[in-house]
Amino acid sequence: MQDLISLEIITPLGMIYQGDARLVVLPGSEGEFGVLKGHASLISSLKAGIIDIEKSDSTHELVAIDSGHAKVSETKVSVLAKGAVWVGGNSDSEIAKRLEEAKDLIKSMSSDSIALASTFAKMDNNVRQK
C-alpha cells in the first residue's frame, strides 16, 4: 500500500478540497515546498499560487489560492486559505472556466509579474497534460 497523506483545503466559504495524496506541493511564503507522509510537523504561511496535489495514481490536481496558512503533521496537511479555486472538471469547457477563475483570483492578489507568469505556466502545463 502506498503512503498517502490526508489533505484538506478550507476557505471562509467552506471546504474546497478533501482527499488523500502521495505528494502535496505548497506555495510557501519563502518558496515552494513538498510534503510526503511522515513529514516533520510545521506551520507555514502561504503566498498566492498553486497547490499541486499528486494522487496515488500519479495524476495531478491543482488548487489556486490567494494566500493562507498550512499546518503539516506526519499524516495530514490542513490549508486555511483566504480564497481558493479548484482547477478541474469533467469537460474541457469546465476546466477552461475554472482555469480563468483561478487566474483572476491570483491576479487580484499579486503584483509580482514573475510569480504570476510562473503560476500561470504551471496551471496551463497541467491542463495541457490532461
From Swiss-Prot:
Membrane topology: Peripheral membrane protein
Cellular localization per UniProt: Cell inner membrane
CDD domains in UniProt: F1-ATPase_delta
Gene Ontology CC: one annotated term: plasma membrane
Domain of life: Bacteria
GO molecular function, one term: ATP binding
Keyword terms, alphabetized: ATP synthesis, Cell inner membrane, Cell membrane, CF(1), Hydrogen ion transport, Ion transport, Membrane, Transport
Entry similarity comment: Belongs to the ATPase epsilon chain family.
Protein name per its UniProtKB record: ATP synthase epsilon chain
